[in-house]
């Protein structure tokens, strides 16, 4: 051994003696051989008995409280990240009491799109609440039974079956081996290898069947022929028309959760999606006092997740896992009863706290469910006697605990020690008393808050004692005591709740990165002494989740104490049976929409219904609020704005107003705000948590995969019980956002699913590119308004699939590509703005030509008024919304996002030159004002039409004979009455007699200039109409009520008058 440098003891390997040769004569000692290559390390010996816990390192001073981050702008809600695989399950709580089922709120009707309000200012972002200490994971209540599956909508008609593909040509049969001699006479010759099968020859006469001879030996089987090539697949039959989606089944009652599957290794934590718009932050419940730090018992069965109950008091503080991203708040399940804590193992070293996960974006604040009844608080078991320790194998000599090194900058989390072999899991004992606290080492310096410092260097391990020989594996030692958690940094101040902004569109969630596998647990750091438990606050009523403030900087991690040996894990206690899942309470009222967040990327829209033909766009009505968005994927950037018809809401569009006679051209309404993508549909029920598997080593953070296509949303199941949150894995990098899907009709706001463990929010994909704003075309003369096309049928709301059970959080699929951003849901296609009719007499401005966008502008009556707006540049054509995909099942409809912003209003093209105003034709009646199309931007005022002639004021008729003058007042100096006949000499003013008869009227004086028209006196008899100006061809509808318009000079006004 020595010559090979292999020390069996230290290597722990097993030397395998070779057979001894006979001893030769003793030679003289040769020169010492060079040391041989180092032997490989033998397999690790059985773990020795756990050494005594090393002295506990001092509790690091609490890091400075994280500052509240500035309120961020409300991010667009990220697309909900795909749910990462559930982290390892925390201890399962005893089943919480199921809350009473809330009544299901009605799905509100989608209102017609209201006019888009201006976006309110984004509410201030609430200060981020400081992350509370992570309570020990409550034990998860039993999973409720899976809800019944909603009835599937009626199946659409089956698509035609595709033709079967042609059968591939059969390959030539392999040669058959020679047949054994046939038993019958007329020996059939051995069958030659079959060539490609020739035409079948005519069958020879059958020989007489001889008596069967003894069977000949079977010929060798010929090689198998090649399989024929597969035929081309037949053409796929046409898809049948999508069936009408059945009404979404009601979410069935939640079925019992299946056993919890092993937790997948946590994937890397996905990047956090952009923060959603902050919901209004409800009042924060009082912060419960942290319960005493129990030893973390084996995970109890997962409690059912009820509605979000009041915030349970924090369970004993477990070691802080890396903070997961904050998922959208689900309803908080009833707090499970506290599971019985298992015996406390010796304290492991405290691992350095993982880095805080990126802050997840808060989903839109769910309507707070009615608070479920708080589950009864599980009894905290009296500390039971520790379950029997498994037999400990013969202890290897305990390595000496290294003295804790001075806390270095917290180091990276050390490699996980080799995980001891788990002993059989003892039944979960009642929580043993906490182990004595190790003597605290000197306090580590307070690290700066913020990133997890690197774990301090671990003091040098004492020399390892020689490894004991590998004992039989003893039963696992009792689990080390869980180190006391380091003090939590003081919580950052809770952010004030921002007003709830209107949630921006959900960003497309990036795909959550794959959750890395969980590394072997590092040795548990010595826990710092638990902070004193604060008094347990009563549960506050659950507020709406406020916007999640930015996470405060993480306090500095305490220094990592020297690792105690990790005890073997005790047996896992049996999971409690899942209690029934309470019905999901009604969704609470939706918080007020705050100001709209910025438009996030458009969520994926549900499939767009096929656009109806657009009617001629009336004036654009104000956009109504968008219908609830289906869970929108990332909302694609608004596609090029097609010519807007009246924009139908995407999805179920409100019916476009009929185009009336073209009203006057309205100002374009603002486009409605883009609806935010609805909140993610309720999470499907979480699959039953399997037993917690050992955590694998953390995998590398997966690359962000490309997003998969968004799956159809299943029917929302009842929300599955959320398994206890495992530590959040690191979020994977966000996948690239897929293109935004088409915006489907917004589904009704789904009930807020229970908050899952917050999944890692995938990073939002970048919003799809905004469609280009078409440049405004010139306004053509308005054509006659096209008839409004029928409103496109909103795609049917796909059936909301039942949410499948919440599988383990798989690695988040890459977010599917968001569908391409649908172009803005189809406004029905606006009919092309009919070609501008010939400009009639400048009465109406013909409906503006193609700017199909604007409804036909009402008649712009008199000429010159806005020239007909040129066609608004094409809003890029609304691309064909692809044929509406089969409506995917819309995800559970998200809440109605704020109305999406309208795409940019195309600029109104320059108004075409107004035709010369003729005398205004008679103003045709103004058509009823069509719905106000978007007002394209007002086209440039066309050239004023020529001012029609002011019709001639009719010739002034000869002045009528003057009425008899009233009595003359005392005569002032009478002005010359036109030249009156020469005044007689004014006698002394007589009484006011009648004036002498007026002399015959003098010839009319020259026509004074027409004074401003005073009030029109009673019209004299109209003079003969002046000659009409040149016809403008438009009809004058000016006598109809018109919206005020900037009027061009109405040349016909005088004429009319």
Curated annotation (Swiss-Prot):
The modification 4-hydroxyproline is found at residues 29, 32, 35, 44, 47, 50, 65, 80, 86, 95, 101, 128, 131, 137, 146, 152, 173, 182, 185, 212, 215, 227, 233, 242, 248, 251, 266, 275, 278, 290, 292, 299, 314, 320, 323, 329, 335, 353, 362, 368, 374, 383, 386, 395, 404, 410, 422, 431, 440, 443, 461, 479, 485, 491, 497, 503, 509, 521, 530, 542, 554, 557, 563, 569, 578, 596, 611, 617, 638, 644, 647, 656, 662, 680, 689, 698, 710, 716, 725, 734, 737, 758, 764, 767, 776, 785, 803, 812, 815, 821, 836, 842, 848, 857, 863, 869, 884, 887, 890, 959, 962, 965, 983, 998, 1001, 1004, 1019, 1022, 1025, 1028, 1031. Residues 1-17 are annotated as: Nonhelical region (N-terminal). Residues 1032-1055 are annotated as: Nonhelical region (C-terminal). It is found in: Secreted, Extracellular space, Extracellular matrix. Residues 1-10, 68-82, 932-946, 1046-1057 have a biased composition (Basic and acidic residues). The modification 3-hydroxyproline is found at residues 724, 1003, 1018, 1021, 1024. Residues 172-184, 835-845, 881-896, 1016-1031 have a biased composition (Pro residues). Residues 37-56, 118-134, 157-170, 218-269, 287-296, 377-403, 412-431, 473-500, 539-566, 623-637, 650-677, 706-722, 751-760, 770-785, 917-931, 965-997 have a biased composition (Low complexity). Contains mostly 4-hydroxyproline. Proline residues at the third position of the tripeptide repeating unit (G-X-Y) are hydroxylated in some or all of the chains. Contains 3-hydroxyproline at a few sites. This modification occurs on the first proline residue in the sequence motif Gly-Pro-Hyp, where Hyp is 4-hydroxyproline. Glycans are attached at residues 104, 947. The keyword Chloroplast does not apply. Its main location: secreted. Keywords: Collagen, Extinct organism protein, Extracellular matrix, Glycoprotein, Hydroxylation, Phosphoprotein, Pyrrolidone carboxylic acid, Repeat, Secreted. GO terms for cellular component: collagen trimer; extracellular region. Residues 18-1031 are annotated as: Triple-helical region. The modification 5-hydroxylysine is found at residues 104, 269, 344, 590, 701, 872, 935, 947. The modification Pyrrolidone carboxylic acid is found at residue 1. Pfam families: Collagen (PF01391). Trimers of one alpha 2(I) and two alpha 1(I) chains. This protein sequence was reconstructed from 13,800 and 160,000 to 600,000 year old bones. The tryptic peptides required multiple purification steps in order to eliminate contaminants and to increase the concentration of peptidic material. Type I collagen is a member of group I collagen (fibrillar forming collagen). This is Collagen alpha-1(I) chain. It comes from Mammut americanum.
